[in-house]
Every structure is written in C-alpha cells, then in structure tokens.
C-alpha cells in the first residue's frame, strides 16, 4: 500500500499537481490502531515507503458529557523515518483517520492545477456534478472549504464538516480547498487518485470552454 502511494506521488509530480515538497497522504487499515502519514519536507517524487511516519491512535472516553477522545503518539517505524517529522497537514489526516471506519482508508491531498484555477475563478465544484455524468456517477464532491490557513486545526475541522464525516462514514469522495488544493478519500490509493484525476479533467474542460 505504501509503495502504491509513492507511485502516486511520482505520477502527481509528473502531472504538475504538486511541486517537489507539496502534497501529503495517509493510510490506515480499520483493524489497526495506527496509521501511516507522509513526512514533512521530503521531495515527494522520490518518496520511499520507509520514509512514512507511523502514528498511534489512542482512544478514550469522558463521562461528563459522554464522548470519545483521541490522542496520538509517534511510533517507531524505520531508522529513516525516525529522522523525519509528520506532514504539516497532520491535524487534517488525524481528524479523518481517527473517525472513518472503512476497512481501508486512504487520504490524499494534492494541488491539481485546473481544479485550483477553477475555484480561484469562482466555479462551484459541486455544480459540475449536474453537468458531467462521469462526475455524478463516480465521484461525489463536497462543498468547497473557503480559504483557510493551511496546516491548522481550523482547516482540519472545516474538512471534516464539508466531507460530512458522521458515525464512521464519509459522505463525499473529494473536497476542494479554495486557492489551495483538494483532499480525496477512498479505500485504495488509486481510487482516491482517480477522484482527483476525474475532477481535474472536468475543470480543464470547463476552463478551456470559457
């Protein structure tokens, strides 16, 4: 799985969806109380599986009022990983990985050119669902998250609200960050990648027609 994520970053870099140190991803299997996340500051086109950070998820409960709480810890993984820090978008990945209960959950964050350009021009990404059947059939688009400072808890909270994560399920496949990028969620790296690819293709068509 991690090897596949590395392949995806090479593909995203070759397509111009990210520059060398952009983008991030995380992977978790439902039965595991940990997940893997890309490190900060690494050239993503040269990502290797041993570079990922391994993050433990600890679950607890409060009685008053009754609610679950989650904490995290960095776990040992590889010697290479030990010298790296988790992605700056950790709050967003942790927020999604601790709540979604799909058997496998993959979260990809990229900066696809035409999709970001479409949002910059004020195009409502959700409105494209009604105009292009390949979107409405295969990719559900969440309401765009307004411009929020990256690598913040505020952005993480807005992401979960827009994707409508509730009782372990996520309603949408992809969400746009205004003037920033997108986050796609699915059960495999390539399925998440295809949501980004599909939306990017449609945005390119729309912008070319204007």
Q: Which residues make up each language-model segment?
A:
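Glycine-rich flexible loops
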Residues: 1-210
